[in-house]
Amino acid sequence: MKWKEIAVLTEGICIEAIAGIFHRLGSGGVVIEDPQAARKYENQEEWNPNLVSPDFLDHEFVLIKAYFMEEREVMEELQSCLETVKENFNVECKVFIDEVRDEDWESSWKKYYHRFKIGERLVIKPSWEEYQPQSGEVVIDIDPGMAFGTGIHASTRFCMKFIDHYVKGGEKLIDAGCGSGILSIAAAKLGAARVLAMDVEELSVKIARENVELNGLSDIITVKLGNIVEEIQTFEADMVAANITAEVVTCLIPEAAKVLKSGGYFFGSGIVDSRWPGVEKQLKTHGFVIEQVLQDVDWIGVAARKE
């Protein structure tokens, strides 16, 4: 199968706006290359200079990449949306298009994606690696393919940590915008009784189902394609996880308030720090108490409890 890589070179102020556009257009994955954000990690222990080009940190502009099936026609709508971005943010946006084959993508993941631990119990690993878990560890096998959600990005780590901390066993959880299915699988592995995983992207649903099957959790996790707001109306939940964008998280909060039991939790992530005040206000407006806020450079994740 062949894919189109569409990349937008622009300024950091409009990262979330363009990532949101790609998401609405049905992208099978978004990659953000931000030298300014990377420079903040340069002196940290986990920084690996081998994962970036030698001159990457010297760049001033960001590159936002998205992936679409070759036959998908999105350029006309994308260009229209980018005109609005340029006008609203007073920036320039330069577009590049390239071809990517499945085997190119897969070989790249196998080169850079390795086992790592999140929280107290969760160990994430690709299926091609062998690992003997230590006492108390819960292992998740993930082949991310071109779907968002490997556990590497801060926004995914935040939600994983919330799930690790708050899931005690027997809960019903909704995973809104499930991507690779990693959050759903984590919840089920930690004892959730039932999980509804939703995404608007066909590719994400396909990959999530494959990962659910890979982990032997098809009897607990249901993966569906469609509108999460419409689907969850009849689903009473103990927890709702939304690792998407601040815009979508804000829209989901009122719906989460309707389906969550009293004392239930909402986990929101993918929130850039400039959008946090709006998300916080929306949570409080709809009867949530902020329990925990995590931040990594510009990214924020929140765990909130319904009163």
Swiss-Prot record:
Keywords: Cytoplasm, Methyltransferase, S-adenosyl-L-methionine, Transferase. GO terms for biological process: methylation. S-adenosyl-L-methionine binds at T156, G177, D199, N243. SUPFAM superfamilies: S-adenosyl-L-methionine-dependent methyltransferases. GO terms for cellular component: cytoplasm. It catalyses: L-lysyl-[protein] + 3 S-adenosyl-L-methionine = N(6),N(6),N(6)-trimethyl-L-lysyl-[protein] + 3 S-adenosyl-L-homocysteine + 3 H(+). It is found in: Cytoplasm. One of its GO terms (molecular function) is protein-lysine N-methyltransferase activity. Its EC number is 2.1.1.-. Disulfide bonds: none annotated. It comes from the Bacteria. It holds the Pfam family PrmA. It is an enzyme of class 2 (transferase). Belongs to the methyltransferase superfamily. PrmA family. Methylates ribosomal protein L11. This is Ribosomal protein L11 methyltransferase.
